[in-house]
C-alpha cells in the first residue's frame, strides 16, 4: 500500500512539474512572439535611421528620411503586431485558407478560386508604376524583417503547428482584393436576385420589393424617390395566396436544408482543449467562422449580405465652424473583431518638393498595405463609406449549339479558357478545382433557368489595382484630392474631404466602368457587341460635389445623387437611407459646429427607422390584448 501511495505521489509530482514546465514554456512562447516596443532593431535596406515613438495608447509615430524608409518601418510594425491577420487577408483573397487551417476552409476557398486573384495580383504587380513598386518592395522587406525578428512566430502558428510564409509584394495586392470581397458583391447575387424577380414576379411586386428608393432617402443631389404602393389583391392576395405568377413558379418558405445558419461556436472548457494539430485547426477554423455552411462569415471578411456592414461620414465647411476650419467625421462599420481591422499610425518623412516642411500622414492604415487609408496629411482630411454603387455585371453566355465548349463573342465563337486551380489542404492531399473563364470574366453558376453566365467585376482588372496614392498623400486642396482618387483601382468609396482653406467635397474613390447599351440592372448577353463595358470613366466624368450651398455633406451607404450621375454609378443595392436622414437632420439642426458637435452625432442612438414600428406595436398591444398572453406582455415591456 505504501508503495502505491509513494508511486501515486511521485506521479502527481511529475504531473505538477510537467504542468508548471508547460506553463512556463507556453508563457515563453507567447512572450517571445510579442512585438518589440523599445530599444534598437537592425533592419536591412534603410537609407537612414528611422525612429518609432509610441504614445500612451501605443499608437506609433514613424519618422524617416524617405517614403521608402517609412514604408519599410511600417512593414516591421504590421508584421510584429498583425502578421496573422495579414496572412488571413491574403489567403482569403487567394483562396488559400485550407492550407493553413485544414479542410474546414475548403468551401470558401473553392468559392473564391473562381476569381483567380493570385494571378490578378501578379499581373497588377507587374503593372505598378516604379514609384509605387519601390514603396511596396520596401514595405515587403520590412514585413519579412519584422517577422523574422520575433523570438518565435505569432502564437496562432504555434497552435496550428505551421510556419508563417514570407510576405510577397503581390500579397499586399491580395489584401486590397480582400477588401473588394468584403465590400462588394463578388458573386453577383444581388443582380441575380433582381433578374429572377423580374422573370417570375408581376412588375408591381418587383417595384415594391426592390424599390429605387425609400422615403428615408436623403441624397446630396436630388429629392427622395416616390415609394411604390403596396400591391393590391389583384396582384397578390395574402388571404388566398393567389398571385399573377407563372404557373411553373411556386412561392414557399425555404426548406431547412436550403437555409444558412450562423455557426454556434462556444469556447471549450479546459478539459476539452485540443491536443492534436487537426483539433487545433478545427477549433481555430470554427472560432473564425470557417464553416462550409456559411462561407460568408469567415475570418471577419464580411460578405455583401452581412447587415453589419455600413459606414457614415460627413463634413461641414469652414464658414460654419468656430475656428474657420472645415471638419470631417467618419466611422467605418466593419465587423467588430480582435484585433481591429485598422491600425492607427503617424507617418512622417521630408517633402522632396519642399525641404522646409515634412509630409505627415495621420490616421489609420490597413495591415498588409503600405498606405494611409483614412486620415489627414495636415492640408486635407478625408473619410470613406462604401458606395453600394454597381461594380459588377452578369453576362448571359450564348453557347455554340455544335460545341458547348465555345461561346459567342463580338468577334465570333471562342473557346472557354480552363484553369486547374490546386488548393493545398493542411493534413491531407490537395484538391483540384476546374475554373472556366471568358473574355469578360469567370464563369459562375447558371441562373434559375439554367443559362450559363460570366461575371464582369472591377476587381478583375489588374492594370488598375494599386496599394498607395502618392498624389493623395501630398494633395493640398479638395480639387487635388478629387484628381488623386478618381480612377484608382480600389473598392469604390464615397470620398468626403475637407481642406485647410475650409472647402469640403464629395466624389467617388475608385474606378467606374463606362457601360454601353444597358444600365447594368439585370443580366444580358454581350455577344453581339451592342452591350458591355467600354473602358472607364475619365476623371472629368466623375460625379463631384464641391462646397454645396448648405455647407454640409453626408453619406451613409445610401443613394447620394440622382439623374445622370446616378446612371453612371448604377445601383448595387443601396442601403435604406435612415442613417443618412438622421445625420442630415442633425447637421441641419445646427448653425455652428465644433469637433464635439460632430462626435455627438457619431454617438447618436436614436433609431428613427424603427420608431413607427414601435408606435404600431404599442398601439396594437393594448392592455386587453396582452392581459391573456404573457408573451405579448413581455413584448410590450421590451418596446415601451
Predicted features along the sequence, with ranges:
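Acidic/histidine-rich, surface-exposed loop or edge segments in extracytoplasmic proteins
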Residues: 115-127, 460-466, 561-565
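Substrate-recognition/specificity elements adjacent to catalytic centers across diverse enzyme folds
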Residues: 20-260, 264-271, 276-327, 332, ...
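Glycine- and hydrophobic-rich flexible loops that cap the catalytic core of alpha/beta enzyme folds
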Residues: 308, 337, 347-371, 375-380, ...
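Hydrophobic alpha-helical segments
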Residues: 444, 488-590, 626, 631-632
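Ordered core of a single globular domain
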Residues: 197-203, 463, 471, 476-482, ...
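N-terminal Sec-pathway targeting helices
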Residues: 1-17
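Sec-exported extracytoplasmic/periplasmic mature domains
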Residues: 126, 141-152, 289-292, 474, ...
Amino acid at each position: 500500500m505504501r508503495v502505491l501511495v509513494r508511486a501515486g505521489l511521485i506521479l502527481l509530482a511529475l504531473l505538477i512539474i510537467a504542468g508548471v514546465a508547460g506553463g512556463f514554456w507556453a508563457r515563453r512562447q507567447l512572450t517571445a512572439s510579442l512585438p518589440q516596443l523599445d530599444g534598437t532593431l537592425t533592419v536591412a535596406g534603410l537609407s537612414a535611421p528611422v525612429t518609432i515613438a509610441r504614445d500612451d495608447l501605443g499608437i506609433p509615430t514613424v519618422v524617416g528620411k524617405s517614403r521608402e524608409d517609412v514604408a519599410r518601418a511600417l512593414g516591421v510594425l504590421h508584421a510584429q503586431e498583425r502578421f496573422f491577420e495579414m496572412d488571413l487577408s491574403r489567403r482569403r483573397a487567394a483562396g488559400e485558407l485550407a492550407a493553413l487551417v485544414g479542410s474546414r476552409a475548403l468551401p470558401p476557398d473553392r468559392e473564391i478560386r473562381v476569381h483567380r486573384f493570385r494571378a490578378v495580383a501578379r499581373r497588377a504587380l507587374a503593372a505598378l508604376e516604379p514609384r509605387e513598386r519601390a514603396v511596396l518592395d520596401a514595405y515587403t522587406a520590412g514585413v519579412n524583417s519584422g517577422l523574422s525578428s520575433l523570438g518565435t512566430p505569432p502564437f496562432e502558428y504555434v497552435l496550428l503547428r505551421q510556419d508563417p510564409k514570407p510576405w510577397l509584394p503581390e500579397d499586399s495586392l491580395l489584401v486590397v482584393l480582400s477588401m473588394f470581397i468584403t465590400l462588394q458583391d463578388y458573386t453577383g447575387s444581388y443582380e441575380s436576385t433582381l433578374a429572377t424577380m423580374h422573370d417570375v414576379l408581376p412588375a408591381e411586386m418587383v417595384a415594391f420589393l426592390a424599390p429605387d428608393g425609400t422615403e428615408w432617402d436623403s441624397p446630396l443631389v436630388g429629392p427622395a424617390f416616390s415609394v411604390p404602393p403596396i400591391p393590391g389583391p389583384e396582384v397578390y392576395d395574402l388571404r388566398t395566396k393567389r398571385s399573377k405568377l407563372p404557373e411553373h413558379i411556386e412561392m414557399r418558405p425555404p426548406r431547412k436544408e436550403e437555409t444558412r445558419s450562423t455557426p454556434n461556436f462556444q469556447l471549450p472548457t479546459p478539459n476539452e482543449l485540443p491536443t492534436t494539430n487537426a483539433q487545433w485547426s478545427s477549433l481555430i477554423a470554427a472560432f473564425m467562422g470557417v464553416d462550409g455552411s456559411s462561407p460568408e462569415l469567415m475570418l471577419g471578411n464580411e460578405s455583401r449580405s452581412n447587415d453589419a456592414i455600413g459606414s457614415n461620414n460627413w463634413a461641414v465647411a469652414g464658414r460654419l465652424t468656430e475656428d474657420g476650419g472645415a471638419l470631417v467625421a467618419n466611422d467605418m462599420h466593419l465587423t467588430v473583431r480582435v484585433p481591429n481591422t485598422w491600425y492607427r499610425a503617424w507617418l512622417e518623412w521630408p517633402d522632396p518638393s519642399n525641404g522646409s516642411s515634412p509630409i505627415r500622414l495621420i490616421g489609420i492604415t490597413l495591415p498588409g498595405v503600405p498606405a494611409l487609408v483614412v486620415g489627414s496629411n495636415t492640408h486635407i482630411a478625408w473619410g470613406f463609406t462604401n458606395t453600394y454603387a454597381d461594380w459588377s455585371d452578369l453576362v448571359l453566355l450564348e453557347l455554340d449549339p455544335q460545341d458547348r465548349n465555345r461561346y459567342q463573342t463580338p468577334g465570333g465563337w471562342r473557346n472557354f479558357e480552363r484553369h486547374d486551380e490546386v488548393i493545398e489542404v493542411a493534413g491531407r492531399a490537395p484538391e483540384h478545382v476546374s475554373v472556366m473563364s471568358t473574355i469578360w470574366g469567370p464563369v459562375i453558376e447558371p441562373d434559375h433557368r439554367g443559362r450559363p453566365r460570366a461575371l464582369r467585376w472591377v476587381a478583375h482588372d489588374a492594370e488598375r489595382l494599386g496599394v498607395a496614392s502618392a498624389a493623395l498623400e501630398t494633395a493640398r486642396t479638395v480639387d487635388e484630392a478629387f484628381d488623386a482618387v478618381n480612377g484608382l483601382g480600389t473598392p469604390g468609396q464615397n470620398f468626403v474631404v475637407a481642406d485647410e482653406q475650409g472647402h469640403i467635397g464629395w466624389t467617388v474613390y475608385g474606378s467606374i466602368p463606362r457601360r454601353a447599351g444597358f444600365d447594368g440592372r439585370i443580366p444580358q448577353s454581350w455577344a453581339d457587341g451592342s452591350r458591355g463595358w467600354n473602358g472607364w470613366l475619365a476623371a472629368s466624368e466623375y460625379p463631384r460635389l464641391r462646397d454645396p450651398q448648405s455647407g454640409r455633406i453626408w453619406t451613409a451607404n445610401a443613394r447620394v445623387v440622382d439623374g445622370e450621375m446616378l446612371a453612371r454609378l448604377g445601383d448595387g443595392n443601396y442601403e435604406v437611407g435612415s442613417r443618412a436622414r438622421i445625420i442630415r437632420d442633425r447637421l441641419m439642426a445646427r448653425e455652428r459646429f465644433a469637433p464635439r458637435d460632430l462626435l455627438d452625432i457619431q454617438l447618436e442612438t436614436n433609431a428613427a427607422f424603427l420608431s413607427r414600428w414601435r408606435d404600431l406595436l404599442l398601439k396594437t398591444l393594448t392592455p386587453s390584448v396582452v392581459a391573456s398572453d404573457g408573451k405579448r406582455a413581455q413584448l410590450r415591456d421590451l418596446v415601451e
